[in-house]
């Protein structure tokens, strides 16, 4: 994980740690002009590792984004940001996207009152995301909310941290996407 962060830069969905800036990163073999292929490959890898996607999943999202109206890049980022695992991460209910995936896979999360165990579930506006009524589920989310630094919540989400409930208000605005993509 840390090799990926050193190579690609900060990936907030993968871990909260940042790459060190200093002489240990100044590898003379990596300096020089980057080719267009290398730039595109690095940006694709950033997307894959940040959102925890396989190559096939990313290609499927690109195919959907190309069919949709508007800028393919913006539509792709909107599709990725509206995934359930990413919304849990943005709400602060999980410290990382892999942690959010685990919460969903272990059936701790309800969407509109129904258990959803698919991390790639595409949330829609007015979806209500809650935890199960079980004590263990609530304790997990409570620990994440208490330990996470309270960052500014995106406009498209609202959270009620006392009831462990999140609401998707609208489709995400492009300025709230936390990943710097070229």
UniProtKB/Swiss-Prot annotation:
SMART domains: Ribosomal_S4, S4. InterPro entries: Ribosomal_uS4, Ribosomal_uS4_bac-type, Ribosomal_uS4_CS, Ribosomal_uS4_N, S4_RNA-bd, S4_RNA-bd_sf. One of its GO terms (cellular component) is chloroplast. It comes from the Eukaryota. PROSITE patterns: RIBOSOMAL_S4, S4. Residues 13-34 are annotated as: Disordered. Residues 82-143 form the S4 RNA-binding domain. GO terms for molecular function: rRNA binding; structural constituent of ribosome. One of the primary rRNA binding proteins, it binds directly to 16S rRNA where it nucleates assembly of the body of the 30S subunit. With S5 and S12 plays an important role in translational accuracy. PANTHER family: 30S 40S RIBOSOMAL PROTEIN (PTHR11831), SMALL RIBOSOMAL SUBUNIT PROTEIN US4M (PTHR11831:SF4). NCBIfam families: PRK05327.1 (NF003717), rpsD_bact (TIGR01017). This is Small ribosomal subunit protein uS4c.
């Amino acid at each position: 994980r840390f090799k990926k962060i050193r190579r690609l830069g900060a990936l907030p969905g993968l871990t909260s740690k940042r790459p060190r800036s200093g002489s240990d990163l100044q590898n003379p073999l990596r300096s020089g002009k980057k080719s267009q292929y290398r730039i595109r490959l690095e940006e694709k890898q950033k997307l894959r590792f940040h959102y925890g996607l396989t190559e096939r999943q990313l290609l499927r999202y690109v195919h959907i984004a190309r069919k949709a109206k508007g800028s393919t890049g913006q539509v792709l980022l909107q599709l990725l940001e509206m995934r359930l695992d990413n919304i849990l991460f943005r709400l602060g209910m999980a410290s990382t996207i892999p942690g959010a995936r685990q919460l969903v896979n272990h059936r701790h999360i309800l969407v509109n009152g129904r258990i959803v165990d698919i991390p790639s579930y595409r949330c829609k506006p007015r979806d209500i995301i809650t935890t199960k009524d079980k004590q263990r589920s609530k304790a997990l989310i409570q620990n994440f909310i208490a330990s996470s630094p309270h960052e500014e919540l995106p406009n498209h989400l609202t959270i009620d941290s006392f009831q462990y409930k999140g609401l998707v208000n609208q489709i995400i605005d492009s300025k709230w996407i936390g990943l710097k993509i070229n």
